[in-house]
Amino acid sequence: MAKIKKKGTSGQAKNYITRTQAVRKLQISLPDFRRLCIFKGIYPREPRNKKKASKTSTPNTTFYYTKDIQYLLHEPLLRKFRDQKAVAKKIARSLGRGEVGDASRLEKNHAPKLTLDHIIKERYPTFIDALRDLDDALSLLFLFANLPSTSHVPPKTIALCQRLCHEFQHYLITTNSLRKSFLSIKGIYYQATIQGQDIMWLVPYRFVQRVNGDVDYRIMATFVEFYTTLLGFVNFRLYSSIGLRYPPKFDTRSDENGAELAAFTLEGRAVANAAKTIEGSNKQSNNSSNQEVSRDVQAKVDKVIKTAGLDKTKDEQTVEATDENTDAIDRFEPAAPEADTLPQPDISGEEAGALFAPFTFYISREAPKAPLEFILRAFGCKRIGWDAVMGDGAFTHNEADTRITHQIVDRPSLPEGALPAVPAAKEGAVPAVRPGTRIPGRTYIQPQWVWDCINEGKLLRPDLYAPGETLPPHLSPWVKPSKGAYDPRATLAEQEEEGEAEMAGEEEEEESDEEMEEAPETKKADAKADESESEDEDESVDGGMDVADSDDDESESGQEEEDFGGFDDNEAASESEDEEEAARTQHQKELEAEAAGLPFSSNGATDDAKKKKSSQAKKIAAKKRKEEEELERQKMMMSRKKRKLLEKMMYSNKKQSEEAAKLRSKRRKLEKTGEK
């Protein structure tokens, strides 16, 4: 006879473990368990049947995989957590005895320090894996870099996040890896391509942040601790891959003066030093009798110099640089018009890096300096100036500098009388320029021009982005308009369906005619309302008493009712009178035109145009009806499954086309009102 299977030894009860059981098994506190799970990348799981997975009667429990908890038993951080707990007990005991010096000594010398290097290597075996997981890390670190320091967020954490973020930005500037950016309500989105991996992160706007108590900063601080270690590894690898020293030199004084990116100085690993060491070994080998070794060393020296490009003159290097810049990306065009359109490659890093290279920009005080400086430098601009109030590191602080070609302004254009006076300049300071003045030979643009240019990959017309102009729509570069969807960048003629403009024109004419007809009716209704009010006043004056003339009025109304014989005769008479009146007025206009010697243009032309429009609309409606009938016949030949799928597709396409038609009609009305 087979043994009775014991409950809870197989299936979901064995595969899952509750959080309380996991904490007891690891013998650590709940906050340490949360930190350990965040560091190791272990998250709660949801079993298919909680009753089978749980051994208790409490339904609201958090489950983990048993294998994950078993994996945590061998983690070296567990010993660190236990050591921290032991040191905390000793510190509490010393404070209880009043031995403050011993407590500070224990905290300073004996507190164990956590290192997450081995966890980074475990979770990301290759560098590509680390790059793929860099989106959330950058978003969180840029968020903490813009937060104010509080009791939950210490200043050291903010300074560390700022330093790592600026180092990463310097790598993007050096390699021209930034591709796209988008201004949204949440913040500024950036996308960079590093070693074939697209990385996107969000940077908040620099507003005054109010820290709420709803956020659990202990959990976020754990993520920040892990992500700072990750970004430090990534920055070291990225800097080493392009031959730069890490970490770069950091000037504390210029950073305190608001230099930000300019506070860092990048240094390359000098190849000449390696060449000198090899040359020194070459001399020693010449003194010896072994000439083969000297040849090998000389070959190594030649190889290093050749790879570094030290054997070429400056002219050759400039010629090669110009040749590389002139190389364009191949475009793949379809051979036949019916063939599929091939996806075209994006702009290369060299073309993107030279977009703003020949220009000198000046950022006004009202424009956001930090994102503009980063984007302009990432796309090749080497000369960026701003006011001295905005910090150090500018190419020039003089707004009247003649070398400036573009000035980024975010103020509305004011009339000459409304401009403020020229501020008084201090001794030895840069002469101030009156706000709102235009310097000849300089292009004034709004900040959106920079973002739209990098998203389009080319320089756009600056007159569309001049101060005071209505800006074009700023669209997301990652959302491409699909077929049938509304595209605000295209004209109405390119998006309208066949006969849509004619139908819209007819509807507007009908609405205008109805408004014209409603106008006299409203006047008549107002007149009737006034008459009824006057009658009510008369009745109120009578006081409800019968007047002698009331019987006569009733008899007259009775006679009128008896004489009334229907509407047919009256309507026919009125129609004939209207026709006679219209013919008479038309004949009178013809006589007046003949007397004046002018050609007479009657309403016949407009009637013909209306008839043509109505005939076109009827043709389009008949064509659509025919297409719908043909589609219905084709649907009858389909199976039920395919027919249902087709109906779902048609329903979604119909909804999309209706939304696009609404947006087009709204745009059509706005354009007409703008023309008026």
Curated annotation (Swiss-Prot):
Coiled coil: 571-676
MF (Gene Ontology): ribonucleoprotein complex binding; RNA binding
Subcellular location: Nucleus, Nucleolus; Nucleus, Nucleoplasm
Compositional bias (Acidic residues): 494-519, 532-541, 548-581
Any one GO CC term of the record: nucleoplasm
Family named by the database record: Belongs to the pescadillo family.
Role of this protein: Component of the NOP7 complex, which is required for maturation of the 25S and 5.8S ribosomal RNAs and formation of the 60S ribosome.
Record's subunit section: Component of the NOP7 complex, composed of erb1, nop7 and ytm1. The complex is held together by erb1, which interacts with nop7 via its N-terminal domain and with ytm1 via a high-affinity interaction between the seven-bladed beta-propeller domains of the 2 proteins. The NOP7 complex associates with the 66S pre-ribosome.
Protein name (record): Pescadillo homolog
